[in-house]
């Protein structure tokens, strides 16, 4: 027998390398076959419910790291709630309508004009469902647990029916109307856009100052005077019908370059410098109110423009006189309504001028800018042309500029219930405080919601028209259409005539001949997803309304958070969510937005195939996702090192509890040694910290840091560091060894449970090596925590010891640096303490040499020699330990060789070996 065989060296089949890319897929297959999600739901039946409602990602393209951050975060929360005693179902969803899918089909060569609308929509549906399947597999591969076989999809007939009913209830309350208003219009999409579909980019635009000669100055101004306006959109001048001034501003008539002009007094200096006037003479001044209802000659059309009073006119820029085109601006439209001006919008759906703009017919609006500028110069109306860069709205899908264009659209009248929404915003639990202000301000400042879209792929607006043009939206027609959609899907709208879509025998006074037509516009996709509280939360029996939480990216303040609370308050009077968490964007390692053009994108698939989903999940737990987060392969490699630390620590604990049966060998807390009690209390503190300030506050980064601090500081650097001298050296059933194994096992079980929501694959692998009742850790509950007798006194003692130990380690490091010792086991440490430290040595009640990993330790009452390292409350002398190195424990002992049968062992090891291996001692070791 070899002497090495007398050591209790840990053994485990738990592999050192995770091999996550392969093993995770095996675990996931096993979980699916065993129905673990369903088992967990059944286990928690009758318990309090926590519902995190999934915001539906768009069913198009590969998932990206933003998706991963979002889905993993949700999964961590839902798993932690399930393990905390909540019934926490997860129903994933997909948003499946909208322009991007139409664009994909166009790029694939689908000829929309060669098929019926219904046939085209069927193609859209096929593509959308194929993307759902692809993304579903990708999300499952992240380790996200949920009801993947029964997701909600916005193209599902039952969902579409629920959306129709939401629309109907809003219409019944008088919140739906049709109006001709300037709205965001995307020429590239040929459709209206909601505010949520707008993003801003810097563009270079012309900046022009234009003179409008006075036509009727009401006796105050003559025809030799001109009003000066400033605009960055020359193409809107063909639609000009007025000039707006502020009634409270002071305006001046000035003489410059031999002409007379009217400008706001406070902007005169700015305008003078911008146009380049050398000398300006102020002729007189007057209030804006005096200009009301004067007229000016349009600079190139034979018509006049009306001067109007408007509070929207500011002194921030321009001249204090605002070019007003009712068909191309919201403020323009509002002020023109007060003066009963018509609305002219002389561009079509493609952004091309119509015959309402003589001289520019067939010209794309942006191409008309230089033409109009030249015409103004020709007419003597152009005072200055310049260019400047500014932020301008763009279509968030096509990334191309949008315009304001007046078209007949269907609107939801936010103004009618705006205050109700704002009141509900106040009641929501905002886990990120600034989120409340952000959504509140958006809703406070937003206009009415344009909900109609001139596209094919979406839920049709369930509106009929009578022969006299009257719109028909009644509870009867809405319910009938909803039932048709539930049975056949919304494509039925495009397959049947209006009369076939109405209830049998339906009549209307506006249709004496019984003829009807139907709306061809579809609903804004934000109305689709914004109706999920009705189509999902109220429809699925395992869910609740309102949901406990919505968790999405911060872009959803203008999107899903906004549309959901709008529709819910409109029909239910309450917010659809009790709490909101938002997350930032995922940026590259240098803080730049990820994009194909920069070549800095990282696909989740690549990370999973190279490192494993648990690495990605651990990364999610390591970042403060409330703000923008950074990721790169370097960052992920660092996370991988942390994972390796976790894995190796757990492997050490598994190996050194391989002969430990918790039912037989567990030592009661009261019977543990002081140091083991200390570690038990520390473990309990960690459990409490992770549960209360980590999971319950959705602070994953705090969990990550708490776990790593415990593994690194408490375990690796202290407890496990000296543990080998006990668990390897002592006999199998030694009391000290069983004490430590008790702590090891409790740590294993507790940390495995606590890490399950974050790294479920690895946690399940560890769990398979433990002797616990539950077959899967996912079916277990989180560990509890308690307060122990004399806990505070115990922790104070060990906190003081840790400070003492730090001083010893510093002294040992000095000795190592001076070549006095190599390893710490070569040292003898003598302490010259004050009374407080002397009492501490007694209170610790442990083999202090063992705790410090030195061969000899002594507390001296003598005066410290000069070579001792001085500290505030002690001096420490490090010397070379006297004696020989024991072949078994590697300590330097003076009693090595004291046992003639085992001459290379110290007295302690000789005793252990003789007691437990008498035959080997008799026969002699190899």
Swiss-Prot record:
Domain of life: Bacteria
Primary location: cytoplasm
Motif 'KMSKS' region per record, residues: 593-597
Family matches, as CDD domains: Anticodon_Ia_Ile_BEm, IleRS_core
Positions contributing to Zn(2+) binding: 886, 889, 906, 909
Catalytic activity, reaction form: tRNA(Ile) + L-isoleucine + ATP = L-isoleucyl-tRNA(Ile) + AMP + diphosphate
EC class (word): ligase
Cofactor(s) required, per the database record: Zn(2+)
Family matches, as Gene3D superfamilies: 1.10.730.20, HUPs (3.40.50.620), Ile-tRNA synthetase CP2 domain-like (1.10.10.830), Valyl/Leucyl/Isoleucyl-tRNA synthetase, editing domain (3.90.740.10)
InterPro entries: aa-tRNA-synth_I_CS, aa-tRNA-synth_Ia, Anticodon_Ile_BEm, Ile-tRNA-ligase, Ile-tRNA-ligase_type1, Ile-tRNA_ligase, M/V/L/I-tRNA-synth_anticd-bd, Rossmann-like_a/b/a_fold
GO MF annotations in UniProt: aminoacyl-tRNA deacylase activity; ATP binding; isoleucine-tRNA ligase activity; tRNA binding; zinc ion binding
Protein residues bound to ATP: 596
Any single GO CC term annotated in Swiss-Prot or TrEMBL for this entry: cytosol
Annotated positions binding L-isoleucyl-5'-AMP: 552
Record text about domains: IleRS has two distinct active sites: one for aminoacylation and one for editing. The misactivated valine is translocated from the active site to the editing site, which sterically excludes the correctly activated isoleucine. The single editing site contains two valyl binding pockets, one specific for each substrate (Val-AMP or Val-tRNA(Ile)).
Complex formation: Monomer.
Function: Catalyzes the attachment of isoleucine to tRNA(Ile). As IleRS can inadvertently accommodate and process structurally similar amino acids such as valine, to avoid such errors it has two additional distinct tRNA(Ile)-dependent editing activities. One activity is designated as 'pretransfer' editing and involves the hydrolysis of activated Val-AMP. The other activity is designated 'posttransfer' editing and involves deacylation of mischarged Val-tRNA(Ile).
Family the UniProt entry places it in: Belongs to the class-I aminoacyl-tRNA synthetase family. IleS type 1 subfamily.
Protein name as catalogued: Isoleucine--tRNA ligase
Species whose genome carries this gene: Enterococcus faecalis (strain ATCC 700802 / V583)
Gene name of this polypeptide: ileS
